[in-house]
Structure formats: structure tokens, C-alpha cells
């Protein structure tokens, strides 16, 4: 029965992989629904405050670029050829060979430069034109040939085109997507978990599928009780920090990166790139030792992975074949950053890693080190790929102390036969015991390793684009991992007496994260167009039913903020009711959700206070608006599942109330100076609420632009 279950788990996993590979969106079992377009009001303020309303911030986000492109090509009344020009250049920059680049460069010149020159519409500098012409004449086509044009294209786009985009519905759609991203709270329900594919000291790794996009990932689940039992909290949090460091910004195809991290009451979960091809240790045992030509491939991709880490001041500290994972096409990524360390502010001293791969300075007590440790480990790993064992396990010794002693004291004697001169020189350079003499530590970092004669035939751009041919391609249609029975299970009795306290939860309060760039790429590759089409239909249908229109409130009135918000109301004020709120300097208007009736009005002088701290009311974080005596309710409670909107409403309400109070106090003092008493003689007794302030607000509200 166990064998049958294992087979069924493998079949289910492989089917999910195949469908995710061809049509990931078709595998989505959960639909994304974008927030209402009114969220633009909130998001525009939020983006302005965070400095993210600038052209570069939006243009360099995947979804921002796609929506700006959509506006330029399908909405803008004036032609916008810059986008296609930009995309052609980006395609050129990814070309592998000089011949490919030359063909593409000539195509770009003919279709985007010459055509505009003939039409006297080439609005770019003479220097950019001459630079391209000169290099094309020489048939010299470096990847950055059109870099000057890219800068000028961006300068043109950030002008009138970008300003018109910000006033369009496409920017509203960007606000909707960004709001969705920033409010994401993942749980286990957002993933379909498949078979186990690995196990570590604190937990297991599973194959999984993201429910709303159909994309396959690896889910690394760490058990909080097991972490507590082994006092591994620092290690778990460090892995989360290191993964976010290497996963943010420019993507690295040679590191197993993280897209999400979230937690359940008993688990810490990392959502990582899924690698289906097994690890180099496994393939070394199956394939046997590699030739130098085969080893060059793995060395080149691993070097680019290390370069990515070192550029972010991260030292990996655990480089070995078992941590180098293959994808289904045979390309590799460095995995498991549990021992990685940020050395930007303080260099580490700890002796951590795997015996036989640790550098002498790591083994030496109290010695500070940095990226130097990884270059030594690289030498050890490459030696093992060529010879089948670590250079410090000549006699297959398993005595850790003996291995460490050899690492600290023994000069490596490379065999005379079986190694080329360049390969021997590379390994000797990487395995130097003295850090200043070691290759990679002489002042130029990864560059001096890449420039070593052993890699003289390597085109590093080709390596980066993953177009170098792998020496080994894992078998398709197989799960390249041990079966669940062999991987085994943890003994639950080990953690039976471990109790999680409130203080344990506090340790992980900042654990959750969404890596923006990677989430946006996932959306763009899967469901972006489908969700946009569904949202367009739903919004059009909703607008047709609304009797009260709220179009472009920001421009047509002095509304401070508007959008959907929930108010505690109903019988016995026991239920949260959805309202459409509009905040003006003098009042708060709360419309029914359908926008089919007049609003409930709350004037600023009726408000005693907007509490500085939000409170938990009926399980929701709520804004508390205290009202003055005589009002039918002692307070108004407002909430929103959208955390950004809730904070912006809270800030705006407090600010509006404070400003109105200051204004009313000034008006009161003026009345005393003019009339000698604190009242307005223009009001009758029936109109006077007790001070001049209400009269002022009533008159002010009559001139506010309403609905």
C-alpha cells in the first residue's frame, strides 16, 4: 500500500509539473479579484509619500511597464514609438552571439532609427546616432551598443506621456495591482502541496503549486517546535534575511531564490524556485567524475551565483555538490542559504560549513573573514567533481578533526596526470591557504576568477543567459528525488513536550514577505491579461448600476480621500456594513455600498476626537471616531481589510479633524474680536448649536463640491 501511495504521489506531482510548464494559468484553482478602482485615491497618496510615483519607480516594475505600454499603444491619442524601440533594444541585449546581435542591431537601425530620420522625426541626440553608426560600420556590436538610446527613450517617456498615463485608467489599474500586492497575506490555503522532495534539520521540502497562478514552487517548511527545541531561531531568521537579500532586485538564475515567506501557527514556510533535476552530489554518484570540459559548465554557473551574493556582501559558507541543484534542463543553482552571512557591517568569525570544504580562515578560531571563504570552497568542490573526493579526504578519511587539520596545515599536491595546466593553476589558486594569495581575493573579486585562463573560451554573457549547453540533462518524466519512504519522517515524540509561547510568536513578527519583482513576474507570465479582462467586465457592469457617480473625485472637488470602508452598524451596532466614504475638510460622507442613496453626514465639529491608536473591535482593527454629546451615536467605528487604506483613512481623518479644529478656533477668536462675544449675530436661536463654529462649517459645506 505504501508503494502504491508513493507511485500515485509521483504521478500527481509529475502531472502538475507538466501542466504548469505548458499552461500554468489553466492550473489556477483560485481566482484573483482586483480591489475596486476607487483604491486609486488611497494608493496615489501612499505612492507619493513613499516616493514611488516617479517614472523610474513605475517603469522599472514589470506590471508598471506593461500597463504603461498598454496605455502608449492602445489609449494614447498621439503615437508613442519609444516603447517598441525600447523592447527591441532589450531583446538585442539578450542576444547570445555577435552574429545574432549584428542582425538584430541592423534591424533596429532600419526600423527605428532610419525610418524616423527619413521622416525627420528622429528626436534623439546626434551623439547617440553617431555612436551606433560608427560601431555598425565596424561590425562591432557590444551588448550595450544602444545604451545611450535607452537613456534618451526614458527621458522622453517620463515627460508628457508619463503624466498622461498617471491621469488614465491604466494608472488606476496599476494602483489596483499594487494594492493587491502590498496587502497579500499568504496561508497554506494559497498552495496545493504535492509530494515531499527533501528533508533537513528543522523541516521538510515539498513540491507545491500556487493556487491563483498555477506556478510550481518548492515549499520549505520549518517546524517552530523543532526550531525551539534545537535553539535554531537565529538560523531560521538568518535564512529568511539572506534569501530576501539575494532574491530582491536583479534576478539571479544561479541561486535558488525566494518569492514568498509566510507562517502558520506551527510552521515557517519559504516558497522557493523549484529544482527538479536532483543535486550534483547525486549525479556525481550516478554519472561518475566529470571531465574538465564538463566541469567548466558547473564552475561557470556557480561563479555567477557567488558573484551575485558577494555583490550584496553575502558570504555563502556552505558550497558543496549536495547544495548545487539542477533544473530539468541541466542548469544549476546554489541552494540552502541557512549558513549564509551578511558581512557588509561586520565580518563573521564563526566556524560553520561542511568539513572538507571549509576554508582555513573559517576553521581558525577568532579570525574574521568575508567572501574569501567561498573561493576556497569552490576549489574544494571543483576538485571533487574532477576526482570524486575532497582534496582533504585523500584516504577517504571521515575523521572531521583530521580533515580540519589537513585543511589548516597541508599544501595541496595536485596529481601530475589528468589535469591540464590551466585547470591545475585554477585549483592551486583557489586553494591557497593565505587569503591575500588566493584567486578571487587579490583585489578584483569574481572578475579575477572569470578572467583566469581556464575560462578563456567562456562567453560570460552566454553563461548568464543560460545558453551554455549542460553536460548532463536529468531524465524527463521522473521525480529526481528519493521516494517519501526513503526520505522518512520526523519523530513527533521528540517535540511532544515543546510548547510555543506568545514570546515565540514575537520572534517571527517580521517573517512574512512578498518579493515584489518575483511576484510581478509570476503574475505577468500567467494570469495578468485574464484578470485584467475580468476586472474590466466587472467594473463596467458595476458602473452601469450606480446612480451616484464618483468619477475622478481627486480633480473635481476638494475631497481628501475616498473609497470603500466598513462601519460598525445595523441592529445593536453588531455588524460591519460596507460604505463608500468621502472625506472633505469639513465633513465625512458615508454612502451605502450600492451608491444609490444619500449619504450619512458627520461634520468635523461633531467629532470630539479621532483616537491616535486603532483598537480591535469584533476581531477587526478599527478607527475610533468619538462624537460630541448630543449625537445619536457616542462613536463611529471604521475598518478595512486593506491595511494601506485603513492607515491612510486614519491619518487623513486625524489630520482633517486637527486642521478643522485649528481653523474653528481661529474663527472663534475673530468673532470675539468683532462682536465681543463668542456667537454669530447672523444666526437665529434655532440655528445656533452653541458656538460660531458650526455656522462656519455649515456655510463651508455649502460651497464644497459634492457628488
From Swiss-Prot:
Site location (Required for receptor phosphorylation): 3-4, 10
Effect caused by changing residue 110 to A: No effect on ability to restore locomotion or avoidance to the aversive compounds octanol and quinine in animals lacking endogenous grk-2
Renumbered residue ranges of the record's region N-terminal: 1-190
Residue ranges of domain PH in the record: 558-658
Disruption phenotype: Defective egg-laying with mutants retaining 35 eggs compared to 13-14 eggs in wild-type worms. Reduced serotonin levels, increased levels of the serotonin metabolite 5-hydroxyindoleacetic acid, increased levels of amine oxidase amx-2 in early adult stages and reduced levels of phosphorylated amx-2. Defective locomotion and reduced body length. Exhibits dwelling behavior with decreased exploration in the presence and absence of food. Exhibits severe swimming defects with reduced body bend frequency in both early- and late-stage swimming.
Outcome when changing residue 195 to A: Failure to restore locomotion or avoidance to the aversive compounds octanol and quinine in animals lacking endogenous grk-2
InterPro entries referenced in this protein's UniProt entry, alphabetically: AGC-kinase_C, GPCR_kinase, Kinase-like_dom_sf, PH-like_dom_sf, PH_domain, Prot_kinase_dom, Protein_kinase_ATP_BS, RGS
Tissue occurrence: Expressed in many neurons in the adult including the ASH neurons and other sensory neurons, many interneurons, and motor neurons of the ventral nerve cord. Expressed broadly in head neurons and is detected in several head acetylcholine neurons including the AVA, AVB, AVD and AVE premotor interneurons, the SMD and RMD head motor neurons, and the AIN, AIY, SIA, SIB and SAA interneurons. Expressed in HSN motor neurons and VC4/VC5 motor neurons. Also expressed in vulval muscle cells. Expressed in premotor and RIS interneurons.
Positions of ATP binding: 197-205, 220
Domain (RGS): residue spans on this chain: 54-175
A molecular function GO annotation: G protein-coupled receptor kinase activity
CDD domains: PH_GRK2_subgroup, RGS_GRK2_GRK3, STKc_beta_ARK
UniProt KW Plastid keyword: no
Result of changing residue 379 to E: In yak18; decreased body length, slow locomotion and defective egg laying
GO biological-process terms attached to the record: chemotaxis; G protein-coupled receptor signaling pathway; hyperosmotic response; negative regulation of dopamine receptor signaling pathway; olfactory behavior; positive regulation of cation channel activity; positive regulation of chemotaxis; positive regulation of egg-laying behavior
Pfam entry (one): Pkinase
Keyword Acyltransferase on entry: no
Active site: 318
Entry keywords, A to Z: ATP-binding, Chemotaxis, Kinase, Nucleotide-binding, Phosphoprotein, Serine/threonine-protein kinase, Transferase
Residues covered by the AGC-kinase C-terminal domain: 456-523
Annotated function: Specifically phosphorylates the activated forms of G protein-coupled receptors. Required in adult sensory neurons for chemotaxis. Plays a role in the ASH sensory neurons in the chemotaxis response to NaCl where it is likely to modulate the strength of the NaCl avoidance response which occurs at high NaCl concentrations. Required in the HSN motor neurons for normal egg laying by promoting phosphorylation of amine oxidase amx-2 which inhibits amx-2 activity, preventing metabolism of serotonin. Acts in head acetylcholine neurons to positively regulate locomotion.
UniProt cross-references to PANTHER family, sorted A to Z: G PROTEIN-COUPLED RECEPTOR KINASE (PTHR24355:SF18), G PROTEIN-COUPLED RECEPTOR KINASE/RIBOSOMAL PROTEIN S6 KINASE (PTHR24355)
Family from the record: Belongs to the protein kinase superfamily. AGC Ser/Thr protein kinase family. GPRK subfamily.
Record remark: domains: The kinase domain is required for chemotaxis activity.
Quaternary assembly: Interacts with amx-2; the interaction promotes phosphorylation of amx-2.
Protein name: G protein-coupled receptor kinase 2
Species this chain originates from: Caenorhabditis elegans
